[in-house]
Each structure stands twice: as structure tokens, then as C-alpha cells.
């Protein structure tokens, strides 16, 4: 089975109820050659699901707690995301790792909880600029893969997103050879355990570079940040993926 193509939009801490009007345009203009996912802030998740009304657009969370319930003020359980209509959840994003001190073990525990709740876990990995400059990119990502993917992961319930930290929201992107090298390493590292897992690239993906990025071997889609907030910016990326 070939990996599924996925265009995933991460709205981060952006958007409000009025912004849900963008979803109408995304639903109306989306291509059928790939899956399309939007991960809004938690307060918009259920309103977004309700607005779609059972359409083909997928909706996901941006994080979940490793516990199923309990005294964890401000946190969200994976089962609560699923109950609200989510199909996916982003885990281990570099902003969570940096801002909240999340470790690989934390990410693995959250992914296990996501799988238990029936969610697809999008597990993020990526190197900092210092690690890239030091020539340790592949070692860093190999360690993140080993530590962040739980033993219950399968190609069906897991997606891997490679996001070089220094490229997120900066307008900078690695060159094609750098992206290809990392994606080939990830594919090889997971060939025995997750042979058909989808591998996404993230980091300043936009309409202008999407076609070129999707032509790279082992790139099955994208995790898109700012360019997913407006349908006019996101739909060309979706179209490029569907055509790849």
C-alpha cells in the first residue's frame, strides 16, 4: 500500500469564529487526489467540524495529554478530541518541544494515548539551525524517531512530519537535496516497522515552492503553517499535492 498524500494545515494559535468562513472555500475548492486536514485551536475544533457537516475535510487537534482524564488543568485528552470530531492530532511540534519542554518520551506517551483514542498521530521531528550547522541532523532525527514513536504505531495510525526548526515561519527552506536526504533516512529507518507511513515536509511551505517540494522522493505531503490560514494561499498547495 502506498503512503497516503496529506495536506495538513496547522493554524497554531490563530483564528477565531469568523475565520471559519475560510473552511467553506477550502471545502468547495479542495482536490480529490489527496487528504486535506485542518488543525485549528482547540476552541474552534468542534465549530469547524459542525460547519463542515460531515464533508470530506478532516479536522485535528494540535496536542493532547498522555492521560485519559483527571486533574490536568488546561490540558485536553485525546478522547476529548475524538469526541469533538477530530481524526488526527499533531504531537511533538518543535514549538511544543521548545515552549513546554516536551521530550521524546512525552511525545511517545501522547502518541500512545492518541492511538488508544482512535486518532492518527502526526509526530513531528526536526533539527535546530545549530544542529544542522554541526552536521548532526540525521543523528538528531534518528534519535527523535526512536524516542517519539510508540510501539503501538502503525502505518495506518501514524504520520511523520519533518520540520527543520530553523525553517518554520522564517521563509527559509532547506534545498531539495537536504529535504531528500532527511526523508530518505526516515523512510529507511522506518522501513521495517512503518513501511507505508506518510512522510510530510513542513517549514515555510507555500504555493510558490509546493510543486517543487512534492516532486522530491519520499515527500507524501506537507504540514503547512501560516499559508493554511487563508483558502487562497492553502488551496494551491493542496492542488500541487494532488497533482504530484
Which stretches of residues belong to each language-model region?
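Active-site loop-to-helix "anion-binding N-cap" substructures in soluble metabolic enzymes
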Residues: 1-244
